[in-house]
Amino acid sequence: MKPVRTRFAPSPTGYLHIGGARTALFSWAYARRHGGDFILRIEDTDVARSTPEAVQAILDGMQWLGLEHDEGPFYQMQRMDRYKEVIQQMLANGSAYYCYTTREELDALRAEQEAKKEKPRYDGRWRPEAGKALPVPPTDVPPVIRFKNPQGGVVAWDDQVKGRIEFANTELDDLIIARADGTPTYNFCVCVDDWDMGITHVIRGDDHVNNTPRQINILKALGAEVPTYAHLSMILGDDGAKLSKRHGAVSVMQYDEEGFLTEAVINYLARLGWSHGDDEVFSRQQFVEWFDLDHITASAAQFNTEKLLWLNQHYMKQLPPAELAAKVQARLTARGVDTANGPDLEKAVVLYVDRSNTLNVLADAVEVFYAHVTPNPELLAQHLADDARPALAEFAAGIATVTWEAPAINALIKETVTKHGLKMPKLAMPLRVILTGQAQTPAVDAVIALIGRDKVAATLAAYL
């Protein structure tokens, strides 16, 4: 059996987005599952829109996702000589030809066809045929080069996601494979690349379905083996509309910036249009072992932000505390927060991780242990009632001698509220707001224990 070779071939006209990342993941996983090779190819022939920054963004995104390639990255702009060589071979063997039809002539042809309610298409006026007399080539019109598409029969393939797909060759006109300035076109370059690189399986978005029959015909004309195709359905946003920039994250790296873990994103992407029974949470290695093309759904996948957040929290809770603390430390350092003069960050993240679904949310929560807290006056007024002030003062006095552990602090709070005839929240809520600036925290005794006796005493003194 021929070794599996897959490829991811993005165009560097923007960031690596979720759809592209899923395509890359599925292509990578299929190669890994079958012990094959995963090739990275940058399709940068759109010179006007391709940028070095976009190339770097793609490479950064692939690295962050951990989708290492075995070969590449290959750049189409560096393969121009090869494309032109193949075009000359096709001209020589009659599978391509020069076309001198001008833009004005094509526009007139289109208008005529539309007036007759016909599908606009090239009429083959420069296509060589047995017994057909061609016009004399004009000297003032630089020609394009067209592929001589078969005129009869069908082009078909068994798509691994969508099933059998057929196109009548009469629906396909003679594709331009080289522009008038000599530069080869996208569909042609893709064919030569897949041929030269020995690609066996093409996994890509279903926006390429209409390109596939053209590419198959070109590959056959080249004498190349046609790869197996799997076209992935689109991804919809939370609202059921096609996923786009307005749904939030525009690039994979934005998920990193927003505090998502790589493994959570990988796990989530894997479930976007593929399933293994009812399994929701699985490792990268388990995904590779399970992944196949048979269980990719042909219907559109719907992005669910809440599910991604749930998964992210799950993976955060699975991290060793030291590793989780290191990730939060990096975010706090970037904010200019010094954690040297506060409690053990490892203990802080363990205390708050159950309430945090991203690293950023966790960093926000624990930052109060290392920064000066100024409670919102409205929040303070809402939770610090006049009848609670004597209890607050007594608690502040009691912390000087209490054993500095959460159970002992909890006992002091209960003793104080009982003595003053109050319910627990009457004292616990103002303590939360004064010490952390937050109305919602983990157990207040655990928070107080972590902040430290001296800082708690000094902070409470300012409100008595």
From Swiss-Prot:
A motif ('HIGH' region) lies at residues 10-20. GO terms for biological process: glutamyl-tRNA aminoacylation. It catalyses: tRNA(Glu) + L-glutamate + ATP = L-glutamyl-tRNA(Glu) + AMP + diphosphate. It comes from the Bacteria. Gene3D superfamilies: 1.10.10.350, HUPs. Residues 113-130 have a biased composition (Basic and acidic residues). ATP binds at K245. The keyword Ribosomal protein does not apply. HAMAP family: Glu_tRNA_synth_type1. NCBIfam families: gltX_bact (TIGR00464). Belongs to the class-I aminoacyl-tRNA synthetase family. Glutamate--tRNA ligase type 1 subfamily. This is Glutamate--tRNA ligase. It comes from Dechloromonas aromatica (strain RCB).
